[in-house]
């Protein structure tokens, strides 16, 4: 024993040293190595058992348990049978004798180690493993311990990790399922006995003034009088130990429900018991008070043990935790979409009982409003309850709605109260998501049963009307100022939205869904609110005071400023709402809802012109930090709302183009009048961009013939082509040039080709681009300036000009031939100049990237218009310039600019190799040479994915669109030959490309892996790649082997399904060869397995040829191979003493 005591003292000393703050990292590594070596010895467990029995040092205890854990999970096969029996006998005894004195985390770890033994040996060698757990639960003094063991067993055995064979996993699951009825019965008994013991009969309280309605509702929800009575009784007071037992039991149930199927084992009695505990969470008083003391002892838990009785009741925040755990159990049941027919009645019972709780939560009393009650509940409980409601609506409403025993309309009434009394913004938005799910359900139901539309809408109309009114009120400061001012409108989240924008977007989505169901009512409600706030805004012109050239808004009183601020914020929100509803006025309902849409559009045009004329956005105000942003936002939102109606305006134009277009012309002309004052570098960018976007939409979507003749649009033309005018911000400049170019390039709708006036428009467009490229064309024949300042100025001219031109090209790339011809005629000189300047700026990454982006747009949109000679000249120039040295310089330089240059170049080549004609075919050898000889060696071993994605896409497109470069035979010939023995050309290049794809599967980057795997699959489906003789004989075994190794090493686990399908497609080329030759050869080459294990793996791989069975066999092979390797890990020789 001396050696054990000495070792214990040494271990305690080492542990203290390891965790001491002055111990160096080097010394820690030495200690760690020593401890690891000690743990690897087969006899180490004896010392560790002594440490567990004798030590009180938590570090020592955890280390000792980790040694057992390692022994059981990684070395168990090598442990002699006699020692296994000793361990299986000793550890449970140790747990039983010391569980009350051990810290909880040590006790939990010891339970886990014992369960790990059960995972390995139950039932063959550890036949009483589960029986012992059940006995622990049934013995009052060890009930908590038994429940911890049960939960751990559920976690570790039902869904075990990959350190077990598939057969063992299936066996464990089957064994556990056999125990489920017994376990659920036991848990029901534990919970019921504690509940019944602590329940007290309370005197019936007098009815509250608000009780009658809710009692009627309760009787509607629950049709079982006894159950209603039970649920209405006051909850019992539980002492701390009973709380703990109940919490453990509910945790067990929650985990069991996560994996067991719905069945009769989940009895009505169990469900009722769970709901008893769920009630504890909706006791509004539980956040701030504790239960009265009780004289009951803990004998129900402790049995005849000598533990002293616990007289103090547990704090009710712990009772609230029981409510949270009970709701977790209910939600685990609710999230199961597959509900057996025999469980439908149980499902109804679950819903009825939960909505009893909802009724309790939303009941108003003299002492508590609904909001106060929700504020006093545990936040976690409210979250769980909201989760339940979401699951009910999204998964089960379709099952329950038609059941006469479930009053859906009354449920919606409760949900309404629950939603609009949420104490937090997050809680409210979560509830809005539930309403959105309900509205989607209703919309889909109506689409599938159009003949019942009126009946369905009629049933829910009152609820929808109330919902719309309240949601609109909630986004208005007039009704909800206190809460709305809490929302952050500055910090952006991951979706680039502020908290306020997210709140508004959620709300408007609900409004839009109601609009689809109740269009007339929704529109009238919204438009009335909009009109009310517009009157305030339009009336501001009466409050203007002029002082010389300056104007001031004469609203100075603090209360008036506050009211104006609220009204402007509300107007901004309502304008966004009106814009969001634009889609509900087009399509089949255009005619029916025309008058409503016309009212909106005319009002929006009036507002935008008003804002631009009196320039409220430039006014001096009493509170400039508040009111000025409000005025700017209203003006910007009015422009954005009008832009949202551009598709409606396009439809309106097509209806009146040939007859009585005067009203339409007036609308467009008036709207355009609002723009020129805003097209200025002095105007706030938010407002400027809104004006630009509106012009783009009118020019691109509506395309009126008369747009170019409107004086306001001609003013914008003059502003943008005036070389002396101050340049606008970059984004605004690009948008305006796009709009003006589209005015001239896009064909007018419903106008014959002969009346499109292309000649005149072409001349105007040439003048426009000449003006925009004036400074750029002055660079012709020049070389880059030597002085840094001049060079930067020149680069700025190049980048700004090419950015505008690229945008112009991209926006007409999908248009007809005439538009593209006209565009290229205007661009021809700039294109030639760009190619001439390219070599001079090859070392300026930012300029080169912009030039390549421009040429990429030309190739994608105007390839035909450029003509073969010029395109060939461009390609040849690029191929000459991008030497291996230049590519290396670009890729290896600091930052990502150089990589972007190469990626843009590869994108251009992608367009080239996809060209169907023969014009660019002569470039294929040069492109392949550049890719595989110059570029690939530079990036192959770089861990960074930069450039790789574009390179492999280029190689894929080259193969896909130029298959006959490698396989020249006709389609008919390849069919007759079955594709496997076609004559091949350029074989060496093909092999090099395939090797590059294969090499990419050995790289860690998952995106490249997924991309390239999909490319191979596409080449197989389109060109039978896997069937080609060269691939089949030389490459296919290597690819399958690599993919299987990837699965075995778990390096790309997210792609398990895709890899399995790819292996199947490769194997299906010749299943016989795969089963008889490849699989045995693959297993023979696998390291770390003995011969018998390889035979078992081969035997277990079922020779079935359908995809599901085959991929299941693949994943079984991978799992079991990993398991065998784990079992075979050899132990290091020698003994290490502490």
UniProtKB/Swiss-Prot annotation:
Q: Which organism is it from?
A: Xenopus laevis (African clawed frog)
Where does this chain mainly localize?
A: nucleus
Q: What is the phylogenetic placement of the source species in the record?
A: Eukaryota, Metazoa, Chordata, Craniata, Vertebrata
Could you tell me which residues belong to the region Disordered? 291-315
The organism's superkingdom is given as Eukaryota
Q: Which Pfam families match?
A: IBN_N, Xpo1
Q: Name one GO cellular component term.
A: cytoplasm
Q: Which Gene3D superfamilies does the record match to this protein? A: Leucine-rich Repeat Variant (1.25.10.10)
InterPro entries from the entry? ARM-like, ARM-type_fold, Exportin-1/Importin-b-like, Importin-beta_N, XPO6
State the UniProt keywords alphabetically.
Answer: Cytoplasm, Nucleus, Protein transport, Transport
Q: Where is the composition biased (Low complexity)?
A: 291-307
Tell me, what does this protein do in biology?
Mediates the nuclear export of actin and profilin-actin complexes in somatic cells. Oocyte nuclei lack active actin export.
Question: Does the keyword section mention Translocase?
Answer: no
MF term (GO), any: small GTPase binding
The UniProt entry's sequence similarity note says: Belongs to the exportin family.
This one is known as Exportin-6-B
Query: Where is the protein situated, by its record's location annotation?
Result: Nucleus; Cytoplasm
Q: What is the gene name?
A: xpo6-b
């Amino acid at each position: 024993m001396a050696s054990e005591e000495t070792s214990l003292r040494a271990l305690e000393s080492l542990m203290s040293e390891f965790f001491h703050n002055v111990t160096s990292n080097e010394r820690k590594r030495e200690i760690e190595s020593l401890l690891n070596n000690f743990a690897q010895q087969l006899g180490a467990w004896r010392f560790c058992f002594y440490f567990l029995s004798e030590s009180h040092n938590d570090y020592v205890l955890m280390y000792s348990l980790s040694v057992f854990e390692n022994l059981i999970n990684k070395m168990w096969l090598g442990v002699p049978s006699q020692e296994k029996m000793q361990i299986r006998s000793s550890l449970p005894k140790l747990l039983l004798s010391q569980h009350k004195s051990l810290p909880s985390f040590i006790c939990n770890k010891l339970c886990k180690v014992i369960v790990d033994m059960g995972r390995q040996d139950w039932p063959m060698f550890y036949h009483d493993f589960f029986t012992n757990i059940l006995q622990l639960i049934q013995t009052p003094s060890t009930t908590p311990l038994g429940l911890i063991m049960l939960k751990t067993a559920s976690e570790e055995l039902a869904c075990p990790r990959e350190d077990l064979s598939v057969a063992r996993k299936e066996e464990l699951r089957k064994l556990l399922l056999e125990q489920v009825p017994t376990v659920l019965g036991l848990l029901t008994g534990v919970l019921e006995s504690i509940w019944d013991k602590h329940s007290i009969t309370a005197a019936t309280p007098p009815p509250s003034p608000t009780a009658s309605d809710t009692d009627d509702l309760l009787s509607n929800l629950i049709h079982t009088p006894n159950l209603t009575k039970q649920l209405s009784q006051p909850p019992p007071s539980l002492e701390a130990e009973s709380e703990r037992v109940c919490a453990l039991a509910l945790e067990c149930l929650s985990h069991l429900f996560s994996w067991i199927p719905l069945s009769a084992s989940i009895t009505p009695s169990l469900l009722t018991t769970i709901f008893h505990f769920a009630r504890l969470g909706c006791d509004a008083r539980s956040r701030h008070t504790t239960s009265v003391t009780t004289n009951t002892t803990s004998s129900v838990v402790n049995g005849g043990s000598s533990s002293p009785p616990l007289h103090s009741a547990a704090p009710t925040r712990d009772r609230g935790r029981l409510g949270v755990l009970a709701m977790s159990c209910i939600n685990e049941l609710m999230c199961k979409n597959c509900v057996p027919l025999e469980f439908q009645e149980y499902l109804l019972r679950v819903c009825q009982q939960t909505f009893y709780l909802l009724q309790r939560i939303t009941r108003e009393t003299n002492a508590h409003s609904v909001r106060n009650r929700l504020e006093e509940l545990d936040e976690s409980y409210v979250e769980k309850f909201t989760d339940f409601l979401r699951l009910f609506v999204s998964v089960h409403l379709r099952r329950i709605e038609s059941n006469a025993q479930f009053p859906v309309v009354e449920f919606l009434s409760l949900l309404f109260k629950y939603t609009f009394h949420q104490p937090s913004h997050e809680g409210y938005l979560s509830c809005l998501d539930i309403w959105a799910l309900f509205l989607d359900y209703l919309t889909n139901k109506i689409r599938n049963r159009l003949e019942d539309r009126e009946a369905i809408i009629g049933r829910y109309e009152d609820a929808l009307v109330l919902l719309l009114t309240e949601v609109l009120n909630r986004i208005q400061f007039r009704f909800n100022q206190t809460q709305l001012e809490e929302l952050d409108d500055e910090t952006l989240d991951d979706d680039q939205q502020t908290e306020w924008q997210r709140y508004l977007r959620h709300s408007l989505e609900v409004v839009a869904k109601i609009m689809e169901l109740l269009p007339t009512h929704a529109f009238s409600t919204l438009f009335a609110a909009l009109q009310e706030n517009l009157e305030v805004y339009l009336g501001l012109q009466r409050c203007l005071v002029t002082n010389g050239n300056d104007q001031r808004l004469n609203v100075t009183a603090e209360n008036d400023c506050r009211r104006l601020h609220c009204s402007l914020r509300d107007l901004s929100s309502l304008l966004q709402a009106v814009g969001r509803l634009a889609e509900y006025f087009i399509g089949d309902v255009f005619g029916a809802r025309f008058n409503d849409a016309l009212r909106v559009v005319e009002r929006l045009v009036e507002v935008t012109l008003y804002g631009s004329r009196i320039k409220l956005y430039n006014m001096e105000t009493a509170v400039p930090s508040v009111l000025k942003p409000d005025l700017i936002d209203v003006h910007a939102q009015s422009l954005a709302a009008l832009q949202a109606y551009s598709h409606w305006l396009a439809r309106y134009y097509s209806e009146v183009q040939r007859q009585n277009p005067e009203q339409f012309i007036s609308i467009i002309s008036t709207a355009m009048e609002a723009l020129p004052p805003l097209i200025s570098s002095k105007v706030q960018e938010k407002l400027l961009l809104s004006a630009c976007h509106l012009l783009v939409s009118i020019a691109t979507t509506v395309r009126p013939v008369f747009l170019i003749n409107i004086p306001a649009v001609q003013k914008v033309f003059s502003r943008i082509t005036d070389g002396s005018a101050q340049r606008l911000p970059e984004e605004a400049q690009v948008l305006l040039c796009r709009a003006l170019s589209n005015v001239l390039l896009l064909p007018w709708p419903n106008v014959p080709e002969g009346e499109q006036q292309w000649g005149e428009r072409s001349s105007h467009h040439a003048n426009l681009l000449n003006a925009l490229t004036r400074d750029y064309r002055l660079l012709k024949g020049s070389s880059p300036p030597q002085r840094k300042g001049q060079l930067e100025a020149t680069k700025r001219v190049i980048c700004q000009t090419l950015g505008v031109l690229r945008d112009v090209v991209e926006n007409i790339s999908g248009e007809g031939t005439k538009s593209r011809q006209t565009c290229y005629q205007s661009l021809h000189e700039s294109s030639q100049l760009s190619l001439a300047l390219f070599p001079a700026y090859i070392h300026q990454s930012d300029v080169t990237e912009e030039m390549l982006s421009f040429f990429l747009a030309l190739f994608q949109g105007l390839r035909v218009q450029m003509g073969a000679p010029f395109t060939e000249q461009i390609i040849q120039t690029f191929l000459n310039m991008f030497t291996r040295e230049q590519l290396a310089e670009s890729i290896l330089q600091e930052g990502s600019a150089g990589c972007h240059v190469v990626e843009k170049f590869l994108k251009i080549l992608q367009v080239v190799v996809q060209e169907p004609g023969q014009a660019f075919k002569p470039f294929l050898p040069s492109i392949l040479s550049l890719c595989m000889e110059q570029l690939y060696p530079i990036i192959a071993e770089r861990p960074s994915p930069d450039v790789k994605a574009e390179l492999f896409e280029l190689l894929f497109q080259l193969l896909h669109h130029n298959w006959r470069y490698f396989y020249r035979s006709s389609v008919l010939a390849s069919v007759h030959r079955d594709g496997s023995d076609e004559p091949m050309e350029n074989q060496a290049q093909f092999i090099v490309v395939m090797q590059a794809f294969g090499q990419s599967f050995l790289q860690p980057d998952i995106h490249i892996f997924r991309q390239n795997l999909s490319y191979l699959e596409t080449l197989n489906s389109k060109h039978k790649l896997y069937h080609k003789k060269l691939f089949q004989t030389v490459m296919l075994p290597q690819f399958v082997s690599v993919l299987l190794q990837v699965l075995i090493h778990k390096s790309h686990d997210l792609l398990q399904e895709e890899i399995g399908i790819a292996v199947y497609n490769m194997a299906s080329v010749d299943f016989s060869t795969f089963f008889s030759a490849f699989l045995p050869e693959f297993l023979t080459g696998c390291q770390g397995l003995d011969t018998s294990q390889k035979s078992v793996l081969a035997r277990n791989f079922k020779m079935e040829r359908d995809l599901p069975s085959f991929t299941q066999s693949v994943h079984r092979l991978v799992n079991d191979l990993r398991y065998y390797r784990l079992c075979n890990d050899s132990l290091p020789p020698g003994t290490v003493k502490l």
